[in-house]
Structures are given as structure tokens and as C-alpha cells.
Amino acid sequence: MFSLPTLTSDITVEVNSSATKTPFVRRPVEPVGKFFLQHAQRTLRNHTWSEFERIEAEKNVKTVDESNVDPDELLFDTELADEDLLTHDARDWKTADLYAAMGLSKLRFRATESQIIKAHRKQVVKYHPDKQSAAGGSLDQDGFFKIIQKAFETLTDSNKRAQYDSCDFVADVPPPKKGTDYDFYEAWGPVFEAEARFSKKTPIPSLGNKDSSKKEVEQFYAFWHRFDSWRTFEFLDEDVPDDSSNRDHKRYIERKNKAARDKKKTADNARLVKLVERAVSEDPRIKMFKEEEKKEKERRKWEREAGARAEAEAKAKAEAEAKAKAESEAKANASAKADKKKAKEAAKAAKKKNKRAIRNSAKEADYFGDADKATTIDEQVGLIVDSLNDEELVSTADKIKANAAGAKEVLKESAKTIVDSGKLPSSLLSYFV
């Protein structure tokens, strides 16, 4: 029990015993926080402090271990990619998938030497015959362990690995099926990436995309048309017997292997040529470039022939103009008099037509809503027509033709001009003035 110390004599406390005390209030209180949770766990599981601390320490160690996982481990196969490897005849190890046996079926030719060593260590720990026997495994799996060892020997030797990679057809990516709809770049990109692993030359140009320039596309296909491949097929050779007593047979096997390799190499080169030719034929950029070249060729031809066309057109035009000029001059004098007469008659007819148009405008406009004044309107329109000169007559007629609904305003404007000029008094044009 905790008790407060007694007050010293120099401290006085005044207590108002008559003051009002606030009533008691019941409030819910709940335990929270990580320390309460730890207490609850210990209570529910009947753990002592030492047991609880040991369990927490193990959790912390596990968390640290998981955070320190080798990133290469994430690239290795978690399970055997091909279960048939477990029963594969070790004597026929060359036909086995060595990358799958090593747990590297996803990496294959991309696997580094360090990754191969790590993967081998992991497979040895898992498939060592002693461990398999202790776990009650089959003795047949000893053969698989021998395949693992052969795979390690092959993949850690640069020459042997190159020979195996040459025959690792699992890593090949087939081209898209003909006659199907597909995205050219998504389908062909992995194909060329897989083929590029055999290139002697670097860097290797990228397939690019729809925005690649003509130069980039041409460089890409030029590279593949002149592709220099190191791919060989020694790995598929028939084993040469180590028999010094029968050298003829040994040389026969060697010649047979060389002929088989040459045949496979020729077939592979032909396959690659056909593959590149098909890619060229289906590349949308090549089609676009050909269309552009065709248009450019036609344009250059048109420009090249432009001079000849212009010269021919100029010559024909000059001849036509000379002929027309001669005919015009020959007829000019003869027709001058007739033309003058026709012009006079035409002007007279036009004037008559304009007068008629002005006179009829009032009638066509239903006398502007004043049909009872039709006679007066007709008379005053006639006075306007007779008072206008030829130029004013044409202008007035054109305005009425352009805006028949505004004929009255046009006539008012003409009447005002006549009155202002003193040609007629306003009393004679009272309707419009």
C-alpha cells in the first residue's frame, strides 16, 4: 500500500467542507496497446515471461532470414520442371533437359555461372542419394543425381555449354502462326531475342516499334540478313569410340558426325533465312516505307516531266494566242461596225429592261400594301424612271433585283435624289418623299 507523507508544519490546507461535490460518473475503461496484447497472449497460452521472449526472438530471426533471401533463389525452379527426369536413363543424359535438371528451366541460356553454382548446390542438397535413401526415396533417383552432375559439368564449361545451348531447342521461340491476327512487335520481339543468343557480333539491334525510323529498320534487317552465328551441333554427335586399334572406324564416325553437323547447320541457316524473310514480309513498317517510296517515285517523275509539260503547254498556248490574235485582228475591222450597233442595241434593251423592272416592282410588291393608291404609285414610279439617268437607272434596278422586298425603300431613295437635284418637285413624288 502506498501512503503519502505527512505535511510539514509550514503547510496549511483549508478545506471547505460545505462545498458541493460533483456526483460520481461511471465510465467504461478498455485495455489497449501492444503490451496488453502481449499480456493477453501469455495469459491465454500459459506462457512464462522467458517462454514468451524466446518465441518473439524466433519470430524476429525468421523475419531477418526472409529479408536476406538471395534474389537468385527467386529465379530458380521451386519444383522439378519435368518429373520424367527422375526416371531418365543416366546413360542417355544428353537427351535430358539439363537446365531443368539444375532447376534453371526459366533462366536457361541467361543463367550466369554464379547462378549455376548456386542451383547445383541446391539440387545436390535435395537429390543426393544419401539423403534420398534416408528419406526412403527410390534407388532409381540415383540416375537423376548423375544427370545433375553431368549437367553441372556441361554448364560450367564454356565450350560444352555453348554446344549444349546450340541444341537447346526448348529455348527457341517459334514465330507467330501464319494467317492469325497478332501484334507484330509483341510476337516477333521474343523470336529475334531468342535467335540473337547465337550472334558472334554485338551489339544486336532491337526490333524497335511502329515509330522506328526507316534507317533503324533497314539496319535491323541488314544485321539479320548477314547474321553470323556461332551455333554448332557437336552436342548431338555420335560418341567417337576410344579405340586405337580400329582407326578407320574412328575416322568414319568423325566424318559421319561432321557431315551431320554440316547438314544441321545448313538447315538451320535456311530456317533463319526463311524466318527473317517472313518477318520482312509481315512487318507493317516495311509496307509503309514501300508505299512512301512509291509515292516519292511518282512525285519525282512528275517533277522530272514538269519541264517538258510546261514547254509543250507554253508552245501550244503561244500558237493558240497567235492564231487567236490573227483571227481577232482580221475580224476586228469587219465587225467593229456591227459590234458598235449591237452594243447600242444591247444598251437600249438593257435600259428598257431596267425601266420595266422598276415600273413592275410596285405591282409585284402589291403596291406596298396601298393597293387603293395603285394609280398614283404607278404614275410616280413612271416619273422616277423617266428622271433617272442611265447610271442611276442601272443602280436602282440592280438594288430592286437584289432585294425585291425592299423595293419601296429603293424607290424612296431615288425619289429623294431626284427632288434634291431639282429634277422634279416633291409634290409630284409625294408618295415616296
UniProtKB/Swiss-Prot annotation:
GO biological processes: 'de novo' cotranslational protein folding; intracellular signal transduction; protein folding; regulation of translational fidelity; ribosomal subunit export from nucleus; rRNA processing; translational frameshifting
SMART domains for this protein: DnaJ
Domain of life, per lineage: Eukaryota
Modified residues (Phosphoserine): S50
Residue stretches of biased makeup (Basic and acidic residues): 292-330
GO molecular function, one term: transcription coactivator activity
One Pfam match: ZUO1-like_ZHD
Keywords of this entry: Chaperone, Cytoplasm, DNA-binding, Phosphoprotein
Keyword Nucleus among UniProt keywords: no
GO cellular component, one term: nucleolus
Coiled coil: none
Location relative to the cell: Cytoplasm
Domain J: 98-170
Ranges for region Disordered: 292-357
PANTHER family, per database record: DNAJ HOMOLOG SUBFAMILY C MEMBER 2
Main function: Component of the ribosome-associated complex (RAC), a heterodimeric chaperone complex involved in regulation of accurate translation termination and in folding or maintaining nascent polypeptides in a folding-competent state. RAC stimulates the ATPase activity of the ribosome-associated pool of Hsp70-type chaperones SSB1/SSB2 that bind to the nascent polypeptide chain. ZUO1 can act as a J-protein for SSB1/SSB2 only when associated with SSZ1.
Note: Present with 86400 molecules/cell in log phase SD medium.
Assembly and binders: RAC is a heterodimer of the Hsp70/DnaK-type chaperone SSZ1 and the Hsp40/DnaJ-type chaperone ZUO1. RAC associates with ribosomes via ZUO1.
Descriptive protein name: Zuotin
Top-level taxonomy: Eukaryota, Fungi, Dikarya, Ascomycota, Saccharomycotina
Gene name tied to this protein: ZUO1
